[in-house]
């Protein structure tokens, strides 16, 4: 199945970030929007190929998608959440998932049936400043994904920290002589 991330007409309003990449390739939280979808698709065993509906000049680097009967078109400005992914994967050909009149996803070339989402944990960006205003929620969402069923490395004694339960150090990552302040949100340190 081809999964197509659509800029949803937001290319200009998310500039300058979208001048060199499609909307779904914006880092929103720890991961890009596309990476958050990839995590859940892999978790559900979905066999897919990624493509984009974006500005033509970006197609040299980012594969252009073609809407077909079995393709899944996803608004590239919405980060994947468990409830949203469940609704998107349940779409049948000709169905579209909407929130407040805005299309979140559609299965196939056209939308014949509109379904309103029941997902309450939606994370989206429509303007460039939303990346910063809503980043805390996106980081928390990604932190849960990246640390689920995993054990953090022990922080060495050369470091100082507070709220160690909000600090995760991935295997292979090194942190020395640092002050880690996790009092207002989680800290994820990936492998070097």
Regions found by a protein language model. Name each.
Residues 1-164:
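Terminal amphipathic alpha-helical/low-complexity segments used for targeting or macromolecular assembly
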Residues 153, 159, 167-179, 187, ...:
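A structural motif detector for beta-strand N-caps
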Residues 183:
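Hydrophobic, aromatic-lined core segments that form the binding pocket/scaffold
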